[in-house]
Design a protein with these regions (language model features):
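Membrane-water interface at transmembrane helix exits
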Residues: 76, 191-192, 218-226, 249-253, ...
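N-terminal membrane topogenic signal
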Residues: 9-17, 203-205
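Hydrophobic transmembrane-helix bundles of small-molecule transporters
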Residues: 165-276, 441-442
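Transmembrane helix-loop junctions and nearby membrane-interface residues
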Residues: 99-106, 188-191, 221-227, 249-252, ...
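Helix-loop-helix hairpins in multi-pass membrane proteins, especially solute transporters
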Residues: 68-205
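Intrinsic disorder in cytosolic terminal tails and internal cytosolic loops
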Residues: 1-13, 196, 453-466
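12-transmembrane solute porter fold
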Residues: 14-39, 46, 50-59, 70-72, ...
Length: 466
């Protein structure tokens, strides 16, 4: 494939194509976020514990992580346009299935099917845009593609909370239908990307072993929460996950055409994105899952009010977004990540202090601040991931980063559920259990600061310099 940079100058910015992919990203995130204010109602409808509904979120995200690595091969084999269009169709149909679910297992199954569509939708579209953008447009493209990750969560909790309060939670999944139909039609016109006449073979063995290892890891986390003191079962599940993941890593490093090219981790900026960035993603994903549960089950608030306050958190994301690129250009990504991480640790201390007697306005300020910090870190890590890779390595870096970040999000939900279930019996009150959970998450956030110090001082200057 030819270089994205033309000999005559930088490649033109593919605005229409980028907006369509951003719209698909928006649809995917809305569906993941809109469910959170309705978790207690979904649990009541199915007769399960609210924390159990974490499976409906984590199963979707883990499916993305397992299948995203194959998305590059599928796009090369069949072409970006038909794959992207088919993915939108699958995602939209699965949304209807979620709305018609009659049990938690059925809902989880439909969410897994959504993950199949999502795994082919956003990564394929994002890679198609990156391939035609060129390095001169990288920061601009990344900024546009990350807007949905910041804007969709603002609308989704309010919409989800309003629907859950005024009607049935089942209607929250139908919002994807008009977006999906419109996106499907536009994709047939706007998406570019030729199919590879001789695509590399798909690493089926790597896909199966890695998928089994990730699934085993999620099941091991769930077994800790459910099995309680049955440590033999927990140990067996954990050992199985470790063995499968070790075998997968060995295979990926020694096969000719690996599902995921781990050797791109030799690029320091990408390696730190995978380590610190994944932990950062894990921690920030846990918060929107915990807050609606705390607001409804402990504070006694309605789904609408809890959704409104979660939206305030994501409003902070948007408010700071225009300043994220200037911040990175002025101070450098390394300094931004370190300072942002330290402030985030303090913010988790504030989240731990939230209580039902605290004025709603004060809670809103804390959540807004949390959203501001979340946005800065999120954008910095996404930019860092692609700052020093290009050419053929861009495909490998995109696949690896997308899979790892989705896995981190899925594990973030599972870890939050595990912490809450573990700490609740030990805490004097339910409110204390949530406070301890936020403090543990703050400690994990502190580890990202330590890792950020390993970045070179001039990290990512190639794409952040004026």
């Amino acid at each position: 494939m030819s270089s994205p940079e033309s000999p005559k100058g930088p490649a033109p910015f593919p605005r229409g194509m980028a907006l369509l992919v951003a719209g698909a990203f928006f649809m995917e995130i809305v569906d993941a976020t809109i469910i959170t204010p309705a978790i207690p109602l979904i649990a009541s409808s199915f007769g399960v514990d609210p924390v159990d509904v974490n499976l409906a979120i984590s199963a979707y995200l883990v499916t993305l992580a397992v299948l995203i690595p194959a998305s590059g091969w599928v796009a090369d084999r069949f072409g970006a346009r038909p794959v992207f269009a088919a993915a939108i169709a699958i995602f939209t149909l699965a949304s209807i299935g979620c709305a018609l679910s009659v049990s938690l297992p059925m809902l989880v199954g439909m969410r897994i099917l959504q993950g199949v569509g999502g795994a082919m939708m956003v990564p394929v579209g994002r890679l198609a845009v990156l391939r035609v953008s060129g390095k001169a447009n990288l920061v601009r493209t990344i900024a546009l593609l990350t807007w949905p990750a910041l804007a969709a969560p603002v609308l989704a909790p309010v919409l989800g909370g309003a629907i859950a309060t005024l009607g049935s939670w089942r209607w929250i999944f139908f919002v994807n239908i008009p977006i999906g139909v419109f996106g499907f039609l536009l994709s047939l016109k706007l998406i570019r990307g030729e199919r590879d006449p001789v695509p590399r073979p798909l690493d089926w063995r790597g896909l199966l072993v890695l998928g089994a290892g990730i699934a085993a890891a999620l099941m091991a986390l769930e077994s800790i929460r459910v099995a309680g003191t049955d440590w033999l079962l927990v140990a067996a599940g954990g050992a199985t996950a470790l063995v499968l993941l070790a075998v997968a890593a060995w295979h990926l490093l020694h096969t000719r055409h690996p599902l995921i090219e781990l050797r791109v981790l030799r690029v320091p900026t990408l390696r730190i994105t995978v380590t610190a960035g994944s932990l950062y993603r894990l921690v920030i994903t846990a918060v929107p899952f915990l807050l609606p549960l705390q607001f409804q089950l402990v504070f006694g608030w309605t789904p609408f009010l809890s959704g409104l306050l979660v939206a305030v958190l994501f409003a902070g994301n948007i408010a700071i977004k225009p300043a994220t690129t200037p911040l990175m250009r002025h101070f450098g990504i390394r300094r931004v990540l370190i300072v942002n991480g330290v402030l985030s640790v303090g913010c988790y201390g504030l989240l731990a202090s939230l209580g039902p007697t605290m004025p709603v306005a004060v809670i809103g300020v804390v959540l807004f601040l949390s959203g501001v910090l979340r946005s800065v870190g999120f954008t910095a890590y996404v930019t860092l991931a692609f700052s020093d890779v290009g050419g053929d390595r861009l495909t490998h870096a995109n696949t690896l980063n997308a899979a790892v970040q989705e896995l981190a999000s899925g594990l973030g939900i599972a870890v939050a559920a595990l912490l809450l279930s573990t700490l609740t019996p030990l805490a004097a009150t339910p409110h204390t259990a949530y406070a301890w959970t936020f403090l543990v998450l703050g400690a994990l956030m502190a580890l990202t600061v330590v890792e950020s110090f390993r970045l070179p001082r001039d990290a990512a200057t190639a794409v952040t310099a004026r």
